[in-house]
Structures are given as structure tokens and as C-alpha cells.
Curated annotation (Swiss-Prot):
Protein name per the record: Elongation factor Ts
Region of interest (Involved in Mg(2+) ion dislocation from EF-Tu), ranges: 80-83
GO cellular component, one term: cytoplasm
Keyword flag Protein biosynthesis: yes
Keyword match Transport: no
Leader sequence residues: none
Keywords: Cytoplasm, Elongation factor, Protein biosynthesis
Function: Associates with the EF-Tu.GDP complex and induces the exchange of GDP to GTP. It remains bound to the aminoacyl-tRNA.EF-Tu.GTP complex up to the GTP hydrolysis stage on the ribosome.
HAMAP family named among the record's database cross-references: EF_Ts
């Protein structure tokens, strides 16, 4: 039997509905950490269903570093004006803007990286490996791994989130989609640095 106290604790920690929390706890045999994992998996599944929905509303979130030498603007979109006005959505925008200030991504998603940049990176990696003596198929695998690392470092959605290194920015957005119940996406961002 799952106690109401445990359900409330899970609900407070995840923002999920009461029945979802109860089911997750039952599935996890009362283990709250496992229940959180169950909810996260379900949340990501929910987020995937919402990903194709139109996001015509949203906010421009901003962050200016205390020294006034770094500033960021982020366009964070959602489906309705109601959600765009919520404190939770605006806080998400603010956190993403601070993340951009700290981590300096160059693109939102890997699909946004120009093909010529990808080809240039591959060329650099191939040049680094040309005298390695490794077979071509091994070199291709190494290049693929290095390219994935490049995306992790330069694409916002694939970066480890500055406030929780356990998650990528994309995971955090998917959790927000599951919690809020609307599709959310970062359309674009710009970072300004004095002197650059």
C-alpha cells in the first residue's frame, strides 16, 4: 500500500499529477527514486507526442551578467499565451538564458549546424588520424565519436545543463513539456560579450 505522504512527496518533487505519482510508486514498489525515473521516462514519452504541435506563443528571456559584460536573449516558444505568462515557463527561459551565458553554445540543435562546418570538422579529425595506422572503418567510427562530442559542446539541446549536469538541456525541456502539457522549444538565442 502506497501512503498519501509518499505520493505527496513525489508530487512535490516532480510536479506530476497525483494518480501518475501513485501509479509510478506502485510500479517502483514504493521506491521514490525509482518512481521519479518511471515518471521521467513517461514524461519524455509524453514530450515526444507533443513535439509536433505548433509553438506560436512564447517569450524572449534575457540574462545580463552582474558585471554587465555578457548578455543573452533566448526565444522560448510554447503553444499558448497562458503558458507563456506562467512563472514556471518564464523561469525556464531565464535558466536557459543563464546556461547560454555560461556554456556559449553556437547552435540550438545539431540539425542547425551548417553542413560545411560538419565537413570541416570531419576533415580536421581525418587529418589528425591519417598517420594512426588504423583501418578506415575504425577511423570512421572515431570521427563519428568526435563529431558527437562536437555537437555536445556546441549545440544547446545536447549540452549538459549548467544547473544539473545529470541532464542535457533537451531533457530539461522535455521534462517541462511533460509537466506543463504543451510543446516547448528554443527557437533561437544570441549572446553578446563586450569587446567581441
Amino acid at each position: 500500500m502506497i501512503s498519501a505522504k509518499l505520493v505527496k512527496e513525489l508530487r512535490d518533487r516532480t510536479g506530476a499529477g497525483m494518480m501518475e505519482c501513485k501509479k509510478a510508486l506502485e510500479e517502483a514498489n514504493g521506491d521514490i527514486e525509482k518512481a521519479i525515473e518511471v515518471l521521467r521516462k513517461r514524461g519524455i514519452a509524453k514530450a515526444a507526442k507533443k513535439a509536433s504541435r505548433e509553438t506560436g506563443e512564447g517569450i524572449i528571456a534575457s540574462y545580463v551578467h552582474f558585471n554587465k559584460k555578457i548578455g543573452v536573449l533566448v526565444e522560448l516558444n510554447c503553444e499558448t499565451d497562458f503558458v507563456a505568462r506562467t512563472e514556471e515557463f518564464q523561469e525556464l527561459g531565464n535558466k536557459i538564458a543563464m546556461h547560454v551565458a555560461a556554456m556559449s553554445p553556437r547552435w540550438v540543435k545539431r540539425e542547425d549546424v551548417p553542413q560545411e562546418v560538419i565537413e570541416k570538422e570531419k576533415e580536421i579529425y581525418r587529418e589528425q588520424l591519417k598517420d594512426s595506422g588504423k583501418p578506415e572503418h575504425v577511423i570512421e567510427k572515431i570521427i563519428e565519436g568526435k563529431l558527437n562530442k562536437f555537437f555536445e559542446e556546441n549545440c544547446l539541446y545536447e549540452q549538459k545543463f549548467a544547473f544539473d549536469e545529470e541532464k542535457m538541456v533537451e531533457d530539461m525541456i522535455k521534462e517541462a513539456i511533460a509537466k506543463i502539457g504543451e510543446n516547448i522549444k528554443v527557437s533561437r538565442f544570441v549572446k553578446f560579450t563586450v569587446g567581441e
